[in-house]
Amino acid sequence: MSNKNIIHLESINASDSIAFQKNYLMNEKPVIIKGMGKDWPAVRRWSATFFKNTYGHIKVPVCYYKTKQQERYRDQVKIPLKEYICLAEKNNHIDSDVELPYLGGWIYYEEFPELLDDIDMMLPCFPDNWLYKLPPSISIPPTNLIIGYKNVSSPLHTDSFFVNSVLTMIVGEKKARMVSPSHTFAVSNGQDLFNPEIAKQVLKQGADIFEGTISEGDAFYIPPGWWHNVINCGFTIAVQNLHVDTYRFPLSEQQIRGLVLPILTKIENLGREAREELFKAEKALPPPLSHQIGCFIEHEKNYITRLKDSAKRSEDFLSSYYLNNSSS
């Protein structure tokens, strides 16, 4: 497959934040941001040796994307960071048919907040981050650390919760291939867009494939909903920062609700069963004392009111903003 079938990703200088917001962030268009992290202390300090010597004893979660694609973060196998980096350095220059572990997203900042001093969490190209406004019980980690090597990669996927994702290279180089959400019909989760046959089939279905290289000190902006497949060109260290702005948060909220509502529905169904049994029992027995002194009826009325208010706010938003803007 010749390069003419692949669309080269655009790039922009990190200092031109206004142009980035206008042309890329607001239009949800991917771009390589040149020099985003070039002045970060991490670029000067972080290395394989730094992490082996400073955090080598820490057990970190590793993933196996081919065999355990949907594995939750808390269920991932943990190995000492020094052991992982030694394995990465050993396997960086050889081909291997055996699936190797990948440190594809270590949520490091809670355990080692000092590492945040080496990066910039308040990216100048982005407005206020709504992830910081979420309650702790449903927080979405705003940053994670990725250490990779030549024989491991993340397969084709989209990021959850409609986040803006910014992948900043600290050490090494990565290549990325992307497909727009408008061409979702041509791809599926877990594919390898760097496989010539798969890429050929995607292009044959009428989809566009975008490709770019992210070098040390540069960042890769991945808009919400975009399919992306990232490979390591050698040993790499990168930071992924997640961001949700005002425009995207209603979509994030919708996905979060999608996780919470099934749990709430199960609880409500159990409550409904209990009420049915209670109604039957009331024919022979009076209501339990706890129902009388625990404000049961008042709480139920308040719950119904909250549900109605929430539904009305959603209806008002659809009619006054979304539907009007869709028809214009």
Where are the language model's segments positioned?
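N-terminal accessory scaffold of Fe(II)-dependent oxygenases
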Residues: 1-219, 227-328
